[in-house]
Amino acid sequence: MTTAARPTFEPARGGRGKGEGDLSALSKQYSSRDLPGHTKIKYRQPTQDAPEEVRARDFRRELEERERAAVKGRDRGAREHTTSSSSSSSSSSSKRPRLDQIPAANLDADDPLTDDEDDSGSDSDSDDDTAALLAELEKIKRERAEEQERKEREQKAEEERIRMENILSGNPLLNLAGQQQQQQQQQQQTQTKNTFSVKRRWDDDVVFKNCAKGVDESRKEKRFVNDTLRSEFHKKFMEKYVK
């Protein structure tokens, strides 16, 4: 008789299976992301601006040294550029034969003489353009200075006017015009108080007045109805949008 259909209870119990004699030695599965990653404290390195290093450093001296190095690099680049340009111009001039060195037999009437003349013409044109630009720049600076001076004069004149007005208004012996204006205002107020005429509105004599109101809302009785279909709002809404 086969025993394959018998219930196997022993393998179903944890720690009692094959090779698992201890209940505490259960199988466990770990992931690499579950393991501790940072197991050591990271300290600040010597070149990472520690507080002691920052206190000991002389920032002004470092800044001055960097500025001197930058100026030296700029000057060296400018000198190299000028030397290269002068060498290139000398080489080009040495390569180009001068007009007096060319024999008359090689000169042709159709050949344009555009070597030195073009260079001198381009130099003169560039000088003229530079002079025109400088003149325009000076003109713009002068106009801006004049505009700034004009604004300052206007501001000073306005401040002086306000100061004189404050002085005159604060002194009752000098503020005669202000006293006259106050007296005139008081007289007008007394005249308006003495007159019993009611001022009319500017739209009292119009023909069509309050045409859109219809029935006076104040005369209607205010009532509350606990029904949405018979409420005043619903009636107004239906009259306005449905009819």
Swiss-Prot record:
Coiled-coil regions listed: 127-169
Biased composition (Acidic residues): 108-130
Bias kind Basic and acidic residues: ranges: 52-82, 136-159
Coiled coil is among the record's keywords: yes
Molecular function terms, GO-annotated: RNA binding
Keywords: Coiled coil, mRNA processing, mRNA splicing, Nucleus, Spliceosome
Nucleus in keyword set: yes
Record-linked Pfam families: Cwf_Cwc_15
Compositional bias annotation for Low complexity: 84-94, 179-192
Gene Ontology cellular component annotations, sorted alphabetically: catalytic step 2 spliceosome; nucleus; U2-type catalytic step 2 spliceosome
Ranges for region Disordered: 1-159, 176-196
Family listed: Belongs to the CWC15 family.
Summary of subunit composition and partner proteins: Identified in the spliceosome C complex. Component of the minor spliceosome, which splices U12-type introns.
Protein's name according to its UniProt entry: Protein CWC15 homolog
